Amino acid sequence: MVTIRADEISNIIRERIEQYNREVKIVNTGTVLQVGDGIARIHGLDEVMAGELVEFEEGTVGIALNLESNNVGVVLMGDGLLIQEGSSVKATGRIAQIPVSEAYLGRVVNALAKPIDGRGEISASEYRLIESPAPGIISRRSVYEPLQTGLIAIDSMIPIGRGQRELIIGDRQTGKTAVATDTILNQQGQNVICVYVAIGQKASSVAQVVTTFQERGAMEYTIVVAEMADSPATLQYLAPYTGAALAEYFMYRERHTSIIYDDPSKQAQAYRQMSLLLRRPPGREAYPGDVFYLHSRLLERAAKLSSRLGEGSMTALPIVETQSGDVSAYIPTNVISITDGQIFLSADLFNAGIRPAINVGISVSRVGSAAQIKAMKQVAGKLKLELAQFAELEAFAQFASDLDKATQNQLARGQRLRELLKQSQSAPLTVEEQIMTIYTGTNGYLDLLEIGQVRKFLVELRTYLKTNKPKFQEIISSTKTFTEEAEALLKEAIQEQTDRFILQEQA
């Protein structure tokens, strides 16, 4: 039989008492009163902050949005199917934040910056708040460098600068996403980081965009943030801010970034859903009163930083879908008033085979020629004027039977100019190729050709110029000016190519 020694027992008790650590941990907790439709009402959580993350006992995370006198309204970041009435909730003391690092390049992530492309975890040591304040006036400088989209119609007449916010607006199926993805493809070799945010899109559409980027080697400098149509409203609402936080990480590291939001009207719908379920009073079109602030605080984060902060930039291209061309609806007018110009895509032009279907008459860039290189300014001024005159003449010519020779010539020139603005999808042009194309059209070198021959001739001319007159490209890329020497080289190339082309066509 084991003998019990009193001194041994007292030693053990003494040791345990010495090891005891008096640590008081205060946890701010609450109880679920009601849950459903992605919303939970919590009693308690007395010291919770607006926008603070809260954690339910079964693991779901939510954001405290409504702080009322007797309860807290929380939006859930998951389905919350296991949350029950009476289960406990604890405040985390953290505002929503995401990890950020260079390792995100080439990846597809969700609104919480978690990878969804099946390629493993992303390593990151730094965190950024999803909602961070926009740079102030002193932190910015005016936009002066061009962000080339590779589309002649935009780069010549509606130029976009680094740090600008340009809205892409139009009906469904008019090529809005195509304009945005072409802009990303054209950033290859330009040292611009691109972020594509898909909000409430079909999974198949996002997969198609990602495949295009992968095939064209654009994923190397691109991050895709995607929340599909079946995602909870909270995550669709957060996705654009997550994209902005990722872009800001690079902007504050003296890099140039471009971010595409596709599309903020879906974010507004998700926010409307959350607000109505939280019983916030509805306003126009049942949107809550602060839906303007929802988009303004997002788009104001795009900026061209001052030289003191390293001159990084973030260019925002929000895409908004209109219903049968109605630009005066609530969300389109809000976003138009926040952005520095808009590119309007028309369903009529799209159906008439003019693609990209940009309506040059009502599209505008409020930065203007400050965002163009000198060479482009030299050739593009004439183009906009001639196209505007052509549009006016064309409307008038429908009613006139006999037109004088000068008017007929002007109409013929206008038709050829419209033809040179047409481009295939995923075929962006370099700025040198654009200058060559515009010069050829505005100086009447296409007037000899039939309209159907214009595109074929221009494709062959680009190839001919690249192989036989490489100095032209060198002059423009080094001096950024359309010099007399460059003009002479271009005239020679056009003349030689025209002779070759006419001989080919006759043969």
Swiss-Prot record:
Gene Ontology CC annotations of this record: chloroplast thylakoid membrane; proton-transporting ATP synthase complex
Name listed for the protein in its UniProt record: ATP synthase subunit alpha, chloroplastic
Source organism (scientific name): Panax ginseng (Korean ginseng)
Alphabetical UniProt keywords: ATP synthesis, ATP-binding, CF(1), Chloroplast, Hydrogen ion transport, Ion transport, Membrane, Nucleotide-binding, Plastid, Thylakoid, Translocase, Transport
Entry membrane topology: Peripheral membrane protein
Keyword NAD in record: no
Enzyme Commission designation: 7.1.2.2
Top-level taxon of the source organism: Eukaryota
PROSITE patterns the UniProt entry points to: ATPASE_ALPHA_BETA (PS00152)
Cellular compartment(s): Plastid, Chloroplast thylakoid membrane
Database matches in CDD domains: ATP-synt_F1_alpha_C, ATP-synt_F1_alpha_N, F1-ATPase_alpha_CD
Major location (coarse): plastid
Family from the record: Belongs to the ATPase alpha/beta chains family.
Stored Pfam families: ATP-synt_ab (PF00006), ATP-synt_ab_C (PF00306), ATP-synt_ab_N (PF02874)
Annotated GO MF terms: ADP binding; ATP binding; proton-transporting ATP synthase activity, rotational mechanism
Primary gene name: atpA
Catalysed conversion reaction: ATP + H2O + 4 H(+)(in) = ADP + phosphate + 5 H(+)(out)
Keyword check for Chloroplast: yes
